[in-house]
Amino acid sequence: MIRNIGSQDRIRRIRTGMGGLDEKLGGGIPAGSTVLLISNQEGPVRLFCQQIAYSLCSEGHRILYFTIVRNPPYIREEMAVYDWDTTELEQGRQWTFIDAYSPRVQALLQGGQGQQSMGFMGPGAMTPGSRALGSDLFVTLRRDILSQLNEGDVVVIDSLSDLLVNHETASVRELLEILGGQIHARNGLVFMPLLSDMHDQRTTATISHLSDVVVEFEVESEHLEGRMRFWKMRRAILRPLLLPFSITDRGVMAETFGRVI
């Protein structure tokens, strides 16, 4: 099981809202952590990120959701299936979609020509809680996430695999080092899904080394259930923890029991 280092009072933890998970993590994820989520299937791990982000936003954390291969309306529709409506949260600036998808698609439609800008999509194309940005993903991340982080903010990078297939691993590593430093200083969280089948072992090992928390999702293809393996966690003495979960009409449900492996 996971044991905290030092007294509980000295370790600030952020509860995910997933009861069985928070219990096994000693009260939640340590604040100031970059969380790498490794899976061979996209659906469950993205659902996990959306569910925790919505729960944290409902508790007062500001969410910056960086989406690369889906536009914000697509993500909203996914979340609406589970009654996670971000409309009011976006209007209140508690939830912001950073849209790196739409500008790239628009550039492709235009043959890659023309200067992209914040307003290229025209009036009314963006809701108050989403920003459509230029095609350079690193510029987008630096300008509209790193420079905007406040205390306790939560960032979702959907997904880290999409960054890695568009940029060199060394460049992504540098970016994650900077992002990790900012998150540590502001006691926030970053969730980074990684689709294991898209990368070699060296790349996965490199990103795992940079991450504060590493979780591997093992999903049974024939059933909507699986196991989470926690291999690494900062500010905790961690023996790899195996936690069963299932996917229900309420999202990802962690079992109230787990076992040490």
Task: List each language-model region with its residue ranges.
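A short acidic, often aromatic-flanked loop/helix-cap motif at beta-alpha or helix-coil junctions
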Residues: 92-94, 100-108, 223, 261
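N-terminal pre-Walker A segment at the start of P-loop NTPase domains
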Residues: 2-19
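Walker A/P-loop NTP-binding active-site region of P-loop NTPases
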Residues: 24-102
